[in-house]
């Protein structure tokens, strides 16, 4: 099960928090914010793109819930226009279904990046592998827990506080 895979991944890296599971969908930023009781911006959406250098790989960008990816910034950082993964590509390239994509325990080859938009928070809530789960993670722990390749600045619609 996806949640168990996420739990094992996080615990193997020293995390000891709780995965939140819901009776109803938390697949959108608004639904997730309502379920966890926070503002939408603190929902960390994991956006899946085709890697311009290697289309059979995913680039996963963990961004705040109130932002949009800027095509020019993405192209400057990754060398090609952003192309969201198609529905049939999502499970194969991310390891999770649409609505449950998260930056933990992804298939080999998936590249995870953390967007600057989430640094304004002490913690954020990414999905935990299903459309009915979330997990609160401190920003300071995200690089280690995700195995991210680094921080990027590819979004617009927010301002540092």
Language-model regions: role of each:
Residues 1-161:
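Extended, low-hydrophobicity, polar/charged segments
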